[in-house]
């Protein structure tokens, strides 16, 4: 299976870059998945969690909102704010706390935020 290149960038710099099997993005019309060979598109992202599947594990990045440019070979994400939640990390609890604050500040829609927060707590 061919790998998709992905980068997540915020105003402060790069949060994540790598080659992945798939990525699930929190689009404003709902979550959508991207695999290698996807049709080209540019879309708006809402506050939520980006789910990244590498060859060996799943990784998660919480974002406040942003834009995604998708081509057949890569996904470039420009986000207003992002927190990379590493699965096996000493500062994982701190990252989850920062992700919760980021999402709570990003949206006034309490129902949407609570469902995303529940998703983060289950990681």
From Swiss-Prot:
Location in the cell: Cell inner membrane
Keywords, alphabetical: ATP synthesis, Cell inner membrane, Cell membrane, CF(1), Hydrogen ion transport, Ion transport, Membrane, Transport
Superkingdom of origin: Bacteria
Pfam families, per database record: ATP-synt_DE_N (PF02823)
InterPro entries associated with the record: ATP_synth_F1_dsu/esu (IPR001469), ATP_synth_F1_dsu/esu_N (IPR020546), ATPsynth_dsu/esu_N (IPR036771)
Gene Ontology cellular-component terms listed: plasma membrane; proton-transporting ATP synthase complex
UniProt membrane topology term: Peripheral membrane protein
Biological role stated in the UniProt entry: Produces ATP from ADP in the presence of a proton gradient across the membrane.
Subunit record text: F-type ATPases have 2 components, CF(1) - the catalytic core - and CF(0) - the membrane proton channel. CF(1) has five subunits: alpha(3), beta(3), gamma(1), delta(1), epsilon(1). CF(0) has three main subunits: a, b and c.
Protein's UniProt name: ATP synthase epsilon chain
Organism per entry: Helicobacter acinonychis (strain Sheeba)
């Amino acid at each position: 299976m061919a790998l998709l290149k992905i980068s997540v960038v915020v105003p402060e710099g790069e949060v994540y870059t790598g080659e992945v099997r798939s990525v699930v993005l929190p689009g404003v019309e709902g979550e959508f998945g991207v695999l290698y060979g996807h049709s080209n598109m540019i879309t708006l992202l809402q506050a939520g969690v980006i789910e990244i599947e590498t060859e060996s594990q799943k990784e998660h990045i919480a974002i406040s909102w942003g834009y995604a440019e998708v081509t057949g070979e890569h996904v470039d994400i420009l986000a207003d704010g992002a927190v990379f939640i590493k699965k096996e990390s000493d500062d994982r609890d701190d990252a989850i706390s920062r992700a919760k604050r980021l999402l709570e500040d990003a949206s006034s829609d309490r129902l949407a935020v609570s469902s995303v927060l529940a998703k983060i707590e289950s990681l």
